[in-house]
Amino acid sequence: MGESITAPEVRLINSDGGPLGVVSRSVALRLAGEVGLDLVEVSPFSKPPVVKIMDYGKFRYEASQKAKEARRRQSGVSVKEVRFRLKICDNDYDVKLRKAISFLQAGDKVKVMILFRGREQSRPELGVKLLKKFADDISEFGSADSLSRTDGRGMAIMVSPIKSKTIVREKSSHAQKGDKQP
């Protein structure tokens, strides 16, 4: 930036993005000073190096905003877990189902686990039946990725959110945020 540019000649671009041609470093610094902006080296490895007349503080701010937005969009999908036993009451089942639906609507994957204890381990078909029932009940909000698999003393399935449901929810939340701003 500015005085740290060492090349004797540079390809100059004005603040609007238009090329001004190849000029000496001193001429480029003088033109940037006349406008009251900074001279920033955009591409140091090209022949001759490309420099641009711009407000460096604004450039750094916009770059940090772009990086922050990219990090926010990159946030991975987390896996939430819902556990229950083979002998679960209807009300408890409904509570677990509602919780799994809320996770799916938030865009998270859900790992549904059934834990076997004692003699329940000798009846895995009951676990498969319960997991199929759970997958059917939740099918409006998510799809079962994997069939039931045995994990030591339990069985589990992974349920992924259906894209259209999460997209609709995100759009509505953005619309609500837009309504609140003046």
Curated annotation (Swiss-Prot):
Stated name of the protein: Translation initiation factor IF-3
Pfam family, one: IF3_C
Naturally occurring in which organism (per UniProt): Tropheryma whipplei (strain Twist)
Keyword field contains Cytoplasm: yes
Assembly: Monomer.
BP-aspect Gene Ontology terms: ribosome disassembly
Keyword terms: Cytoplasm, Initiation factor, Protein biosynthesis
Annotated gene: infC
Any one GO molecular function term: ribosome binding
SUPFAM superfamilies in UniProt: Translation initiation factor IF3, C-terminal domain, Translation initiation factor IF3, N-terminal domain
Function text: IF-3 binds to the 30S ribosomal subunit and shifts the equilibrium between 70S ribosomes and their 50S and 30S subunits in favor of the free subunits, thus enhancing the availability of 30S subunits on which protein synthesis initiation begins.
Gene3D superfamilies: Translation initiation factor 3 (IF-3), C-terminal domain, Translation initiation factor 3 (IF-3), N-terminal domain
Subcellular location: Cytoplasm
Domain of life, per lineage: Bacteria
CC per GO annotation: cytosol; membrane
Family: Belongs to the IF-3 family.
Stored PANTHER family: TRANSLATION INITIATION FACTOR IF-3, TRANSLATION INITIATION FACTOR IF-3, MITOCHONDRIAL
Lineage of origin: Bacteria, Bacillati, Actinomycetota, Actinomycetes, Micrococcales
